[in-house]
Swiss-Prot record:
Protein's cellular compartments: Secreted, Extracellular space, Extracellular matrix
Name by which UniProt lists this protein: Latent-transforming growth factor beta-binding protein 2
Annotated disulfide bonds: C185-C195, C189-C201, C203-C212, C385-C395, C389-C401, C403-C412, C538-C560, C547-C573, C561-C576, C613-C624, C619-C633, C635-C648, C661-C683, C670-C696, C684-C699, C685-C711, C839-C852, C847-C861, C863-C876, C882-C893, C887-C902, C904-C919, C925-C936, C931-C945, C947-C959, C965-C976, C971-C985, C988-C999, C1005-C1016, C1011-C1025, C1027-C1040, C1046-C1057, C1052-C1066, C1069-C1082, C1088-C1099, C1094-C1108, C1111-C1124, C1130-C1142, C1137-C1151, C1153-C1165, C1171-C1183, C1177-C1192, C1194-C1207, C1213-C1224, C1219-C1233, C1235-C1249, C1255-C1268, C1263-C1277, C1281-C1293, C1299-C1311, C1305-C1320, C1322-C1335, C1341-C1353, C1348-C1362, C1364-C1378, C1405-C1428, C1415-C1440, C1429-C1443, C1430-C1455, C1481-C1494, C1489-C1503, C1505-C1518, C1524-C1534, C1529-C1543, C1545-C1558, C1578-C1601, C1587-C1613, C1602-C1616, C1603-C1628, C1729-C1740, C1735-C1749, C1751-C1764, C1770-C1785, C1780-C1794, C1796-C1809
Originating species: Mus musculus (Mouse)
Tissue specificity comment: Expressed in the anterior chamber of the eye.
Database matches in SUPFAM superfamilies: EGF/Laminin (SSF57196), Growth factor receptor domain (SSF57184), TB module/8-cys domain (SSF57581)
First-listed, main subcellular location of the protein, grouped into a coarse class: secreted
Length: 1813
């Protein structure tokens, strides 16, 4: 630690120490990243957050601004006198620094204003006589005291430095106290010096002068005499860091060990030593990205002299490592885990083109224990270093550094005093390391994440690997213990090439150093973006205003916007900063460095290449190769880049081979070729071609791999080979040469004997150094230098021939030793001092693109192929091969870095011979088709044609055939045909004649007698004949011949045809035809015109015949239909003589009647009514006629006898005892009872003995005050209790505790038991119902008028809400009206976050799955814990935590209203959460009631299953009902199906119309039972098994009688089935209405309700006898009555309702309702609705005017009452057309039902009935 800055007194030194300590402590407490420094080094809050850190409780920010402490920090030097452990300690109990802090507090009256710091003027350097332009610092805000006397501001002062009540001259009051303890220096101290005493400045290190205005020149360290050698002084312009993430370091360069002689100032070369030594008390505050708990960047600090400078001259950055005292952070680390992936790249060259192919290996994990680890299988070795090795040192063990020759110490941080002081053994260790078979890559990475640590745990990892591999590190983590490996890792993407000296690659922790030129001031740090250091998403383009095409990895804003990106962002995308026309090279203008596209600022003077290949997604299907300022996508052999340069396509996609394209392909044959030859990709990618080429190659189908190979862009698009090849050639020339050559060098083994001197590679980073732009009017040239891994650029000399000064980073030491040039063009030998290895100690690429070979007296450069030594003979430069004319005038030579290429002229082709290229002549004469019709002679770059006879030379140099036929007279008597080189005369064809060398047509029609029986038509070269009717053209079409019409059957089809010349005749017509008048056809004969045809019918003529129809009665047409024959009426089962015997006659029949029948009209037997005229059944019966007979209907007390023809008395006393309690006496037609005791009396109606009820009301009760209970023949007296009491076994009346039933009084009150009764004490917002047995909600909106003012009042359960009509307003409870909503204000009252936050989290809700693992069945994906656990859920959340049980405290807290109720989001009243019924159908709709419909009830839900399903409570689904278990198929085999069943019948049985019975269709008796065939009497009433009140007028069938008004049928009095039975429903095709009415729940046919009817309660009636109509959910039970009598016995007269029948017994004999069940509606619950009845049969919705009802289907809104009333569809004239045809309509609640008439069945679809088949 250096000594503090000296001053004139010791006390001042002490104050300086505390003065430096105070602001640092406050900065640590306050956070230096939140502060900005003003022009004199003080800190001010950078935002309102900084002010908030200092605000006292309850103070206003404006008032607190005067309390902000002024901070002072020296970022480049540690605080004197303090250890790093004290930096984070809070300042406590020190009156010295506290008084100093109070002295620095600004007065309350200070004003914040902006001032300009003094502008530093140009001054002459004391040694270099160079002008340095001082830069003015940007304007900053600072606190400045107004110019008023201190006494006027503070009043009278006391204490020291006070003169006359005011501060003495040179002193002023401090900012925080009223004492004159602050010295005044005018003018103020510069360069951040401090004013210690009046007019006395204490300067910072590196500055001197009265006002610290002079920069102390740097000193060189001379190891010969161990004394500092002064260098040119360096000035540093003051300027505060405006970014909260300021980075910076003070870098001092050291000259070589042997100082050269001082040349004249104008000729001196400034060549800094590449290994940097940092001196001076500098400290760099840096920020490392970390993933802390809050996601913020951690602040870390490094001390002086602990910075590692990369040994590469191209890597102009400083790597900051951990300080020595930070080692305690990793002392306990015994094991380090390193995960990396090796990559091996090889270079293949073919046909003059080279390509890179890289193959990644397996991801390797090595553990470093004790400082190093080794994997013998993979050949990799890693070193883990806990100490930093500086000045080019390398870590070779856990706590050991290998130091170069010019440094020493544990960290290589001390310079070597003398050359002979180097410790022994180090050099040998270094040589052993280099001679090994492995190479090393070095990475400096953070080991773990720490919160605000000043000593970051950075580790330096060296990976030794085979030379052909490179390494990519994924993870570096610490392992705390062997048994419990707790990893603390940082994932990184660090790439490094194999460098033997451990140069750091793209380390994301490399800071921006500022290398200082000799004689030039260090430039201020760059102005960093507010996004500096953040990683975000980089976008390549936008689509419809939205960012699109994101890259695959996160990048910084500088890397994104400086390379390929247009938009960038962390949480949202923003356009990249506008980039002006960027320079082609880096320039510095107005103090800012501008980099070209593809580069980013490395520091104030260097631009570093952006490695775009580190960003995923640029080269989609290709390999990415980084180039200078850009990148390149390369492809594997057989592939090439498309025009987008980012995708590899097959070289078949740009094949230039041409062939025929066929538009049709069938049966392997190609047809319809195109005219021109085209390529295969144009043919097959254009949807035109089906096949291509000479072999008829079929085009590949779209979507196949073959199609994508030739059509990578899809249908309608092809690639241009010229574009692709030109771009590839350009890429090879400008971009591929250097990277590929460098990789070739790296993979090439060194020559024999040079293994110990391997070539030194440059760092992978590329940087460009820029000179400062001159001022306007300066005529000096701008000097720009670039440096790259393969080509370090040089600055040429000026016009006067002076050698240009070397630039920093070239790494060429300045040496007075002589140079010896070896006779070679690429070897330079330089003599150096003893013990000086320039190839190692210097930059790794001292020779540039060549190999540096150390010599005893210097070094030599062996240049790579394509390079030559620079004229200065000190490094390799590109060899311009084009100067030697390698293309020999046959093409254009294009030079490239390290190579060249020839662009051959037409007529020449490129030939590559090894490393050379040349253009050779193309022999066009060897190509087919050249000089056709002549002789070809090849020439240089072209060819020449000599034409044969018959050809002529054309302009293009080709031979063209002469067409001799163009000359008239060539062939006077024939036709001339041209041929290649000649012609031929041919004779004219038939029909033509020669004329002037051509053939003309002959008109044959001019010849007489041609075309007899026709007309001649002349044609070109021939003629044809058009014949008359009856003639046809001859085969040669030159004559006409007769047509034989008789050869076709169409002539005379019903007769004989005779052919004649030109015509024909018909004869011998068939029966029914005759010959017409012209004899050419046989016409039909009308037989009906002749008399006597069809005498007993009507004759109808037909073609060729006739038929007899409409025969007379008793006749019918015979099978031939040509006569009417007699009908035998006596044949067949249905004889016309019913009740008699039939006898057939001609045209009629005769009836012979049986007894009981009589003949009517001689044709039928009619029943004789014996009951007319004679009294056969008198006097005790009524005569009823029957078919062929009669029977007697006897009066009560009489029975039929003698076959039913007589009535006789019934002895009632003989059959049963009709007189219980008495004696029976038979009488005529009746009986009488003689009662035995006085407790019975005869009935006046029936005469039976009836019990006398002694307990009936009478004046003198038989039991007095006791309760009388009647019994047969007697009675008993029972002690009775008042209501609310029950009788105990001992006879006492005990009070009934109604409150023992928890359901009494509901959920909104509690029960208070009283004697004989109880009362309900209701909660707030509820009141007792009129019955006093429950608590009902109080409608505050109706009771309290205008309770919400002008807002809408909405009543909720237990309270009310005030809602504003507009969403832009909110209700103010204090003012009582709506006011505009404040921005950001919450509508619901603010409550504690910790109480409300869990209820807002929505996660998965699970149900218990029987037999399966937990959390295997998801109820809902987006449910709160209350919605899940208060309803049907069993587990909730990502952790699948079980829901609390209903009897737990957690459940009562989560679900205070009980099961089925959830809190209403946003609804608060009087500070309490409102709860409402949970609609499980909405929350868990898809998981509930599958194969059915879910219906919400309060509380719970119900499942309405589809037909064929029943509800399963365990799975909450509707399961298939196995109908086959219910004997569904009679006489057949039942097969169950999902939701239905099917009956399989065995032959000859078939399935009837019901689908449930197999019947025999061959037997008529099976199809038509007797009671459906015969007609008989229908009885309307049956009493005591006696049928009475017959239906008079007509007889009916059994079905008609029972389904209309009858109760029995036929003479046997067959009883009809009960109307509530299944037999009646099947017989009459109606639903069991009585069964529906008997149930407490109104069932809809075809659906099952609830958890199954077996689970319904036995008693669906309440205490008042009214049935409960609420539907039962899967977990609910029927509501218990408010109270019950425990002493009630099962035998009491308690109304009991039997469970209704199963739904399977209700189907399927009904016509379903027309309307479907109402769909699920979402609306307000009844308790939330502002309508009195809650919109029953509809849903309640809120509108602007209030509330209204949205009615379900089948209901309509009644406007006056706001109620949904049923629509009577049966009376609606506008309803369905012909509603319930063939049946009658019955209106139901919300729908209607059709009942089909007998003989009709229900049809699917529209509601109507169809006749049975």
């Amino acid at each position: 630690m250096r000594a503090p800055t000296t001053a004139r007194c010791s006390g001042c030194i002490q104050r300086v120490r505390w003065r430096g300590f105070l602001p640092l402590v406050l900065a640590v407490l306050m956070g230096t990243s939140h502060a900005q420094r003003d022009s004199i080094g003080r800190y001010e809050p950078a935002s309102r957050d900084a002010n908030r850190l200092w605000h006292p409780v309850g103070s206003h920010p404006a008032a607190a601004a005067a309390k902000v402490y002024s901070l002072f920090r020296e970022p480049d030097a540690p605080v004197p006198g303090l250890s790093p452990s004290e930096w984070n300690q809070p300042a406590q109990g020190n009156p010295g620094w506290l008084a100093e802090a109070e002295a620095r507090r600004p007065p309350r009256t200070q004003q914040l204003r902006r001032v300009q710091p003094p502008v530093q003027t140009r001054r002459s350097h004391p040694r270099g006589q160079q002008q340095i332009a001082a830069r003015a610092a940007p304007s900053v805000a600072r606190l400045e005291t107004p110019q008023r006397p201190a006494a006027a501001r503070r009043g009278r002062l006391t204490g020291r430095n006070v003169c006359g009540g005011q501060c003495c001259p040179g002193w002023t009051t401090s900012n925080s106290t009223n004492h004159c303890i602050k010295p005044v220096c005018q003018p103020p101290c510069q360069n951040r010096g401090s004013c210690s005493r009046p007019q006395v400045c204490i300067c910072r290190s590196g500055f001197r002068g009265a006002r610290c205005e002079e920069v102390i020149p740097e000193e060189e360290f001379d190891p010969q005499n161990a004394r500092p050698v002064p260098r040119r002084s360096v000035e540093r312009a003051p300027g505060p860091h405006r970014s909260s993430e300021a980075r910076g370091s003070l870098v001092t360069r050291i000259q070589p060990l042997v100082p050269p002689p001082s040349p004249p100032p104008s000729r001196r070369l400034s060549q800094p030593w590449p290994l940097q030594q940092h001196s001076g008390p500098s400290r760099t505050v840096r920020r490392y990205p970390a993933t802390g708990a809050n996601g913020q960047l951690m602040s870390n600090a490094l001390p002086s002299g602990l910075e590692l400078r990369d040994s590469s001259p191209q890597a102009a950055h400083v790597n900051h490592l951990s300080p020595p005292w930070g080692l305690n952070l990793t002392e306990k680390i015994k094991k380090i885990k390193v995960v990396f992936t090796p990559t091996i790249c090889k270079q293949t060259c073919a046909r003059g083109r080279c390509a890179n192919s890289c193959e990644k290996g397996d991801t390797t994990t090595l553990y470093s224990q004790g400082g190093h680890g080794h994997d013998p299988k993979s050949g990799f070795r890693i070193y883990f270093c806990q100490i930093p090795c500086l000045n080019g040192g390398r870590c070779i063990g856990r706590d050991e550094c290998w130091c170069p020759a010019n440094s020493t110490g544990k960290f290589c941080h001390l310079p070597v005093p003398q050359p002979d002081r180097e410790p022994a053994g180090r050099g040998s260790r270094h040589r052993t390391l280099l001679e090994g078979p492995l190479k090393q890559s070095t990475f400096t990475l953070p080991l773990s994440n720490q919160l605000a640590s000043v000593n970051p745990s950075l580790v330096k990892v060296q990976i030794h690997h085979p030379p052909e591999a490179s390494v990519q590190i994924h993870q570096v983590a610490r392992v705390r213990g062997e048994l419990d490996p707790v990893l603390e890792d940082n994932s990184v993407e660090t790439r490094a090439s194999h460098r033997p000296h451990g140069n750091l690659g793209h380390s994301p922790w490399a800071s921006n150093s500022i290398p200082a030129r000799a004689g030039e001031a260090p430039r201020p740090p760059p102005v960093l973006s507010r996004h500096y250091g953040l990683l975000g998403q980089c976008y390549l383009s936008t689509v419809n205003g939205q960012c699109a095409n994101p890259l695959g990895s996160l990048t910084s804003q500088e890397d994104c916007c400086g390379s390929v990106g247009t938009f960038w962002g962390v949480t949202s995308c923003a356009p990249c900063p506008p980039r002006q026309e960027g320079p082609a090279f880096p320039v510095i203008e107005n103090g800012q460095l501008e980099c070209p596209q593809g580069y980013k600022r490395l520091n104030l003077s260097h631009c570093q290449d952006i490695n775009e290949c580190l960003t995923l997604g640029l080269c989609k299907d290709s390999e990415c190769v980084n180039t200078r300022g850009s990148y390149l996508c390369t492809c594997r052999p057989g592939l090439m880049l498309d025009p987008s340069r980012s995708r590899c396509v097959s070289d078949k996609a740009v094949s230039m081979q041409q062939g025929l394209c066929y538009r049709s392909l069938g049966s392997g044959t190609c047809t319809l070729p195109l005219v021109h030859r085209i390529t295969k990709q144009i043919c097959c990618c254009s949807r035109v071609g089906k096949a291509w080429g000479s072999t008829c190659e079929q085009c590949p189908l779209p979507g196949t791999e073959a199609f994508r190979e030739i059509c990578p862009a899809g249908h309608g698009y092809t690639y241009s080979s010229s574009d692709i090849r030109l771009s590839m050639r350009k890429a090879e020339e400008e971009e591929l040469a250097s990277p590929l050559r460098e990789q070739t060098e790296q993979s090439t083994a060194p020559p024999p004997g040079q293994a110990e001197r391997q070539p030194l590679r440059a760092a992978t980073a590329t940087w460009i150094e820029a000179e400062t732009l001159p001022d306007k009017g300066d005529s000096r040239a701008v000097q720009i230098t670039t440096s790259a891994p393969h080509l370090p650029a040089r600055v040429p000399g000026d016009a006067t021939g002076r050698p240009a000064p070397s630039l920093p980073g070239q790494g060429i030491p300045e040496s007075p030793a002589e140079e010896q040039v070896i006779p070679s063009s690429d070897v330079l030998v330089t003599h150096s001092p003893p013990d000086f290895d320039p190839c190692f100690a210097g930059a790794s690429n001292i020779c540039g693109p060549g190999t540096c070979v150390s010599l005893p007296n210097g070094y030599r450069c062996v240049c790579s192929p394509g390079y030559q030594l620079h004229p200065s003979q000190d490094y390799c430069t590109d060899d311009n091969e084009c100067m030697r004319n390698p293309c020999e005038g046959r093409g254009r030579c294009v030079n490239s870095v390290g190579s060249y290429s020839c662009l051959c002229y037409p007529g020449y082709t490129l030939v590559t011979l090894g490393d050379t290229q040349e253009c050779q002549d193309i022999d066009e004469c060897e190509q087919p088709g050249v000089c056709s019709g002549g002789r070809c002679s090849n020439t240089e770059g072209s060819y020449h044609c000599e034409c044969d006879r018959g050809y002529i030379m054309v302009r293009k140099g080709h031979c063209q055939d002469i067409n001799e036929c163009r000359h008239p007279g060539t062939c006077p008597d024939g036709r001339c045909v041209n041929s290649p080189g000649s012609y031929t005369c041919l004779a004219c064809e038939e029909g033509y004649v020669g004329q002037s060398g051509s053939c003309v047509d002959v008109n044959e029609c001019l010849t007489p007698g041609i075309c007899t029986h026709g007309r001649c038509i002349n044609m070109e070269g021939s003629f044809r004949c058009s014949c008359e009717p009856g003639y046809e053209v001859t085969p040669d079409k030159k004559g006409c011949r007769d047509v034989d019409e008789c050869a076709s059957r169409a002539s005379c089809p019903t007769g004989l045809c005779l052919n004649t010349e030109g015509s024909f005749t018909c004869s011998a017509c068939q029966s029914g035809y005759w010959v017409n008048e012209d004899g050419t056809a046989c016409e039909d004969l009308d037989e009906c015109a002749f008399p006597g045809v069809c005498p007993t019918g009507v004759c109808t003529n037909t073609v060729g015949s006739f038929s007899c129809k409409d025969c007379d009665q008793g006749y019918r047409p015979n099978p031939l239909g040509n006569r009417c024959e007699d009908v035998d009426e006596c044949e067949g089962p249905q004889s016309s003589c019913r009740g008699g015997e039939c006898k057939n006659t001609e045209g009629s029949y005769q009836c012979l009647c049986h007894q009981g029948f009589q003949l009517v009209n001689g044709t039928m037997c009619e029943d004789v009514n014996e009951c007319v005229g004679e009294e056969h059944c008198a006097p005790h019966g009524e005569c009823l006629n029957s078919l062929g007979s009669f029977f007697c209907l006897c009066a009560p007390g009489f029975a039929s006898a003698e076959g039913g023809t007589r009535c006789q008395d019934v002895d009632e006393c003989a059959a049963t005892d009709p007189c219980p309690g008495g004696h029976c006496v038979n009488t005529e037609g009746s009986f009488s009872c003689l009662c035995e005791t006085a407790s019975f009396q005869p009935s006046p109606d029936s005469g039976e003995c009836l019990d006398i009820d002694e307990c009936e009301d009478r004046e003198d009760p038989v039991c007095g005050a006791w309760r009388c209970e009647n019994s047969p023949g007697s009675y008993r007296c029972i002690l009775d209790c008042q209501p609310g009491f029950y009788v105990a076994p001992n006879g006492d009346c005990i009070d009934i505790d109604e409150c023992a039933n928890d359901t009494v009084c509901g959920n909104h009150g509690f029960c208070d038991n009283t004697d004989g009764s109880f009362r309900c004490l209701c909660d707030q917002g509820f009141e007792t119902s009129p019955s006093g047995w429950e608590c009902v909600d109080v409608n505050e909106c109706e009771l309290m008028m205008a309770v919400c003012g002008d807002a809408l009042c909405e009543n909720v359960e237990g309270s009310f809400l005030c809602l504003c009509a507009s969403d832009l307003e909110e209700y103010d409870a204090e003012e009582g009206h709506c006011r505009p909503r404040v921005a950001g204000a919450q509508r619901i009252p603010e409550v504690r976050t910790e109480d409300q936050a869990p209820s807002l989290i929505r996660m998965e809700c699970y149900s218990e799955h029987n037999g399966g693992p937990p959390c295997s069945q998801i109820l809902g994906q987006n449910s709160t814990q209350a919605e899940c656990c208060c309803t049907q859920g069993a587990r909730w959340g990502k952790a699948c935590a079980p829901c609390p049980s209903e009897d737990s405290v957690e459940f009562s807290q989560l679900c205070p209203s009980g099961q089925g109720y959830i809190p209403v989001e946003g609804a608060w009243t009087f500070g309490q959460t409102m709860y409402t019924d949970a609609d499980e159908c909405v929350l868990f709709g898809p998981a509930l009631c599958q194969n059915g419909r879910c219906s919400n009830i309060v509380p719970g839900y119900i499942c309405l299953c589809n037909p064929g399903y029943h509800y399963d409570a365990s799975s909450r689904k509707c399961q298939d009902h196995n109908e086959c278990q219910d004997l569904a198929c009679e006489n057949g085999e039942c097969v169950n199906q999902e939701g239905s069943f099917h009956c399989l019948c065995n032959p000859p049985l078939t399935l009837d119309l019901s689908g449930q019975r197999c019947v025999n269709t061959t037997s008529s008796t099976e199809d038509f039972p007797d009671h459906d065939i015969h007609m008989d009497i229908c009885w309307k009433k049956v009493t005591n098994d006696v049928c009475s009140q017959p239906l008079r007028g007509h007889h009916t069938t059994y079905t008609e009688c029972c389904c209309q008004d009858g109760e029995a049928w036929s003479q046997q009095c067959a009883l009809c089935p009960p109307r509530s039975s299944e037999v009646y429903a099947q017989l009459c095709n109606v639903a069991r209405i009585e069964a529906e009415r008997g149930a407490g729940i109104h069932f809809r046919p075809g659906y099952e309700y609830g958890p199954g009817l077996d689970d319904l309660p036995e008693n669906l009636y309440g205490p008042d006898g009214a049935p409960f109509y609420n539907y039962l959910g899967p977990e609910d039970t029927a509501p218990e009555p408010p109270f019950s009598n425990p002493a009630s016995q099962p035998g009491d007269n308690t109304p009991v309702l039997e469970p209704p029948l199963q739904p399977s017994e209700l189907q399927p004999h009904y016509l379903a309702s027309h309307s479907e069940p109402p769909a699920s509606f979402e609306g307000l619950q009844a308790e939330e609705c502002g309508i009195l009845n809650g919109c029953e049969n509809g849903r309640c919705v809120r509108v602007r005017e209030g509330y209204t009802c949205d009615c379900f289907e089948g209901f309509q809104l009644d406007a006056p009452t706001l109620a949904c009333v049923d629509v009577n569809e049966c009376e609606d004239l506008n309803g369905p057309a012909r509603l319930c045809a063939h049946g009658h309509c019955e209106n139901t609640e919300g729908s209607y039902r059709c009942h089909c008439s007998p003989g009709y069945v229900a049809e699917p679809g529209p509601p109507h009935c169809a006749a049975k088949e």
